[in-house]
Amino acid sequence: MTKEEYDLNIEKLISWANAYYVFDNPIATDEEYDKLARLCLAYEQENPKLSHPNSPNKRVGGIVLDGFIKASHLSRMWSQEDVFNTQELEDWIKRASKVNTNLEFFCQPKFDGASLNLIYENGILKQAITRGDGTVGEDVTNNAKTIFSIPLEIEEKSLIEIRGEVVIKKADFEKINIERAKNGEQLFANPRNAAAGSLRQLDSNITAKRKLFFNVWGIGQNSLEHKKYSQIMEYIYSLGFERPQMQTLASNIEEIESLYHKFISIRNDFEMMLDGMVIKIDDIETQEELGYTVKFPRWSCAYKFPAVEKTTKLKAITLQVGRTGIITPVAEVEPTLIDGSTVSRATLHNFDEIERLDLKINDEVIIIKSGDIIPKITKVFFERRKGDEITISRPTSCPTCNSEVLDEGTMIKCQNLDCPSRVVNSIIYFASKNCMNIDGLGNKIVEQLFNEKKIYDILDIYSLKYEDLQDLEGFKEKKINNLLNAIENTKGSELHRVINALGIEHIGEVASKQICLEFGLDVINKDYDSLIALDGFGEQMANSFIEFMRVNKNLVEKLISIINPKVEIKKEVSENPFKNKTVVITGTMSKSRGEIKSMLEDLGAKVSSSVSKKTDYVIFGEDAGSKYDKAIELGVKLLTEEEMNSLF
């Protein structure tokens, strides 16, 4: 076979593979495909340097791993802000319009699958990482290479992250479950679970057989210079990625609503599961000005489909005790299939909600579920009552430790700090992904260790030894070593992660970062006045933090001595023209807006997204637009990029 013949045969193989795996429309028999693939493979083995970068032979599974290793995203994979109705959408647009009143919106289908980040360097697929906690995920590169809708090589040579959703088509999902039923295996609940499970197979042969599909929805780190998000996406599709159906630009809320309702009308006919529509501000400069909250970009939202309603029956109420002692009622209902998954429990929030609904055991009720939202009861059919309904009473004692509870109306609390449920849930929270991220220390393992009297509090995690675990059910050598290594790896974590992991009421990730940056290790000794003086730190937060430290200070001190956390040093900014000044950036400059923003913040400036009388400087480049005009109108001092640089 000559090189020219080989290239032609590879193009034919790629065409056949795409027809089968991507478009579900085979144009060659298995025998024809296998025969040609073997011929090409023989050529590749003899001429490895001449092999085609996207040869289907490079996608074949065969690698079996012991486990997945952790890998970091180059830039964070953010969550999406959810909106559920027209009013919430209007509110989101109103917030975005404060930066730019002339908005265009890039709308695309929201696929219900498993998020994946592809890292290409010099045009080669180097790594594929699951979302994980948004910062660190799992390396599934070998499995990603078996997915035919993921190019192994692209023409873009700069370092770039291309992100999307791994899904399974509904028809393929049905075939997989039929096969699993024949083999006596547990069925997948829905296509999303099947896609996520298939992507995380240790044996890439299994992944290769599942006909996974990759839908691009965005990018992470990149050096592209397009001014519109829609232009970026068109470029990404030109690199060999599939373009989703019904992706378009909208100029106003009416056009967005029209497209959204089209999605709703065809969602059941769509070949893949959808759970909404993603809306993004199209202008890149506006995206940069809007920036991010702690959880999601302000320039993007997910317009979720309406919740699916079903009728079921309330069988019982289970009481759950959280780490702060709050007792939450959970509805146990007759198992009901909703939107592809079986629901047997629903949230009730608190006992005020039970009283508002006038809910009784044995009532027939309406239960709703939408995507990831926890199912909840919205209505009781009073007219269907038969007389065997049982009134639900507010608890007077803790269901776990039997201590007397404090009933504050909306909240009912167990005040016993040694309550087993409080202790277990505090340990679970401490070890969770968004806190200390101790892989292998999930809910069931924590409960097992607590029940076996191996741990009694957070500190005991760090005293665990091999011999403590070797006789426990389900613990083998590898599992024990992995857990002990995961615990050891938390040592040297940032101080704010440790404080956040303590689960102090009203003190979340943002507040933890703020107080740790301000006070360092001395944070545990701070009084009310010191805390309340911080910007955005309210009375409730300060009182909660002080009370927690009063009760648990000894434990926290020991924990800090064991973990020896990293302390971020607050930079002391020397006097300069930008210190404590409010600055607005507009227009195109030689450096990116993000770089300039970072430089100014390092100098002690507050970079704002809008011009007002309180603005000290507006720094402008080419195509400055309305912010430049507003600065002139208000008499705000204007600086060119050169003038700004001269002040550094």
Swiss-Prot record:
Binding site residues for NAD(+): 30-34, 79-80, 131, 165, 280, 304
Cofactor(s) the protein requires to work: Mg(2+); Mn(2+)
Enzyme Commission code: 6.5.1.2
CDD domains according to UniProt: BRCT_DNA_ligase_like (cd17748), LIGANc (cd00114)
Cited InterPro entries: BRCT_dom, BRCT_dom_sf, DisA/LigA_HHH, DNA_ligase, DNA_ligase_AS, DNAligase_adenylation, DNAligase_N, Hlx-hairpin-Hlx_DNA-bd_motif
Active-site positions on this chain: 110
Keyword tRNA processing included in the entry's annotation: no
GO biological-process terms attached to the record: DNA repair; DNA replication
Residues given in the record as Zn(2+) binding sites: 398, 401, 414, 419
Catalyzed reactions per annotation: NAD(+) + (deoxyribonucleotide)n-3'-hydroxyl + 5'-phospho-(deoxyribonucleotide)m = (deoxyribonucleotide)n+m + AMP + beta-nicotinamide D-nucleotide
SMART domains: BRCT (SM00292), HhH1 (SM00278), LIGANc (SM00532)
Key words, A-Z: DNA damage, DNA repair, DNA replication, Ligase, Magnesium, Manganese, Metal-binding, NAD, Zinc
Cross-referenced Gene3D superfamilies: 5' to 3' exonuclease, C-terminal subdomain, BRCT domain, DNA ligase/mRNA capping enzyme, Helix hairpin bin, Nucleic acid-binding proteins
Cellular component annotations (GO), alphabetically ordered: cytosol
Function: DNA ligase that catalyzes the formation of phosphodiester linkages between 5'-phosphoryl and 3'-hydroxyl groups in double-stranded DNA using NAD as a coenzyme and as the energy source for the reaction. It is essential for DNA replication and repair of damaged DNA.
HAMAP family registered for this protein in UniProt: DNA_ligase_A
Protein's UniProt name: DNA ligase
UniProt gene name: ligA
